[in-house]
Amino acid sequence: MKALTARQQQVYDLVRDHISQTGMPPTRAEIAARLGFRSPNAAEEHLKALARKGVIEIVAGASRGIRLLLEESGLPLIGRVAAGEPLLAQEHIESHYQVDPALFKPSADFLLRVSGMSMKDVGIMDGDLLAVHKTQNVRNGQIIVARIEDEVTVKRFKQTGNKVELLAENPEFKPIEVDLREQGLTIEGLAVGVIRNGNWS
């Protein structure tokens, strides 16, 4: 790694601290305001310099698209998942949250942004971050993250022989029925906790 100038180190430290405190990178405007730059464009130039030196990666098209390459600690947050790609593929990781995985039992391996209200009756709401322990060993009655033909879903697991039911916790949603002889089902992990609006629950 090339040495950073004093100003570049300030920008890097700000990005790292902002991620540590809020779970997400700052915007260019926030960097400019904190460090007294005249415009977000000045912040962008410093970020590009840091990217050239290999300490960050700039993710195109995202206002908070900054990824630390030196010390990307914490739990990866999985956003939109592309068809045919592993759930934890780099391009699915929106950011990292500075959360101790050991706070969950069993320990969490990643966070998944919940979409929809199918699990609202157990307190899992649209937009929540679901802490997930990566495993394929699950038991009936547990809440799991599953992938069916590239659709990722959070449901309660029930298996009888070759038949699996993925049960919603909302009477407005019907169970998803899977015949393992005819359809692919991948267990991505076990739900071990929920973060709502940055708070534990």
Swiss-Prot record:
Signal sequence region: none
Alphabetically ordered keywords of this record: Autocatalytic cleavage, DNA damage, DNA repair, DNA replication, DNA-binding, Hydrolase, Repressor, SOS response, Transcription, Transcription regulation
UniProt keyword Repressor, yes or no: yes
DNA-binding region: 28-48
Reaction catalysis annotation: Hydrolysis of Ala-|-Gly bond in repressor LexA
Enzyme class: hydrolase
Site (Cleavage): 83-84
Lineage top rank: taxon: Bacteria
GO MF annotations, alphabetized: DNA binding; serine-type endopeptidase activity
Active site: 118 (for autocatalytic cleavage activity), 155 (for autocatalytic cleavage activity)
EC number: 3.4.21.88
Subunit record text: Homodimer.
Family listed: Belongs to the peptidase S24 family.
HAMAP family: LexA
Function: Represses a number of genes involved in the response to DNA damage (SOS response), including recA and lexA. In the presence of single-stranded DNA, RecA interacts with LexA causing an autocatalytic cleavage which disrupts the DNA-binding part of LexA, leading to derepression of the SOS regulon and eventually DNA repair.
This protein's name: LexA repressor
Species the sequence originates in: Photorhabdus laumondii subsp. laumondii (strain DSM 15139 / CIP 105565 / TT01) (Photorhabdus luminescens subsp. laumondii)
Organism classification: Bacteria, Pseudomonadati, Pseudomonadota, Gammaproteobacteria, Enterobacterales
